[in-house]
């Protein structure tokens, strides 16, 4: 591999903005903010959504029940199914 063309792969702190949870992982992301954890300074990246706050992972997911096009068609067809237009 060529020297100097690859981004720096380092430990970075990702913080969930909604819950405030922080976790350290490795990444090549660039950020200006830093945070100190256990006496060591890490770059800080703030995330809007992580597995700590996303409804799919927390179990707080609510399903939106919305009538689709097929159901709307069937409802409309059911109302008019009994009435047949007579040919004059």
From Swiss-Prot:
> What GO biological process terms are annotated to this protein in UniProt?
translation
Which Cys-Cys disulfides exist here?
Answer: none
Keyword terms, alphabetized: Ribonucleoprotein, Ribosomal protein
State whether keyword Ribosomal protein applies. yes
Q: Name one GO cellular component term.
A: ribonucleoprotein complex
GO MF, one annotated term: structural constituent of ribosome
| Sequence similarity | Belongs to the bacterial ribosomal protein bL31 family. Type B subfamily.
- Protein name according to UniProt: Large ribosomal subunit protein bL31B
